[in-house]
Amino acid sequence: MTTNKNLDENISFEEALSELEEIVKKIDNGQETLEAAVNSFERGILLKNHCEKKLKEARLKIEKITKLADSTITLEEVEV
């Protein structure tokens, strides 16, 4: 597991969430040393933030689609 302060922005929501769930299990079960747990916690924060960003992007895209008044569907990339 990578514990660097940079997270690959190309990681999918599902991959990030799965890794975050594994980190939570390890910390909850006490399977790591204190130092490893702190590193895992730091990685978990990065993953949580990444998941929140992906969810926000999806929500904004859905809002744009549903606000179209003339019933035509167009997708426009949203920068967050």
UniProtKB/Swiss-Prot annotation:
The keyword Transmembrane helix does not apply. One of its GO terms (molecular function) is exodeoxyribonuclease VII activity. Its EC number is 3.1.11.6. Keywords: Cytoplasm, Exonuclease, Hydrolase, Nuclease. Belongs to the XseB family. Bidirectionally degrades single-stranded DNA into large acid-insoluble oligonucleotides, which are then degraded further into small acid-soluble oligonucleotides. This is Exodeoxyribonuclease 7 small subunit. It comes from Rickettsia bellii (strain OSU 85-389). The gene is xseB.
